[in-house]
């Protein structure tokens, strides 16, 4: 099984290490990349279509930092490649990257929508962020 995601927790800033790790995964093929970090209790994320190099440039413009972070290079299976569908998917309390297919995502999405959760993307992964928050 191969992975396209990275997670690092440290007592030092992790953004650069996550980007460097994502660059090592580029050979696997992907259509978008993203990163989320936790700093002072707040989740910050940056996502983009295209290469990790473009993500790195976007990060420089946002000054995203944190001692905990996740990242993913994504090959779309649900939802077209777009910034909205790119990973990570976050709620106020959790950020998720996922490689695979959530078979019952449609059912879970309907249950969560009845509880008042709003979905931004066309992906199955966003369900996890809301489900964990619930």
Labelled PLM ranges:
Residues 4-134:
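Conserved short alpha-helical segments that host acidic/polar catalytic motifs at enzyme active sites
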Residues 1:
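Active-site loops and adjacent core secondary-structure elements that bind or stabilize anionic groups
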């Amino acid at each position: 099984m191969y992975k396209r995601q990275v997670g690092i927790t440290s007592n030092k800033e992790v953004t650069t290490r996550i980007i460097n790790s994502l660059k090592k995964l580029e050979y696997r093929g992907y259509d978008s990349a993203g990163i989320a970090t936790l700093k002072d209790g707040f989740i910050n994320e940056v996502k983009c279509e295209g290469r990790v190099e473009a993500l790195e440039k976007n990060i420089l413009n946002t000054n995203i930092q944190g001692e905990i972070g996740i990242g993913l290079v994504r090959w779309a299976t649900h939802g077209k490649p777009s910034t909205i569908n790119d990973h990570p998917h976050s709620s106020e309390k959790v950020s998720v990257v996922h490689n695979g297919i959530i078979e019952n995502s449609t059912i879970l999405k309907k249950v969560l929508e009845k509880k008042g959760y709003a979905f931004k993307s066309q992906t199955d992964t966003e369900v996890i962020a809301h489900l964990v928050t619930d």
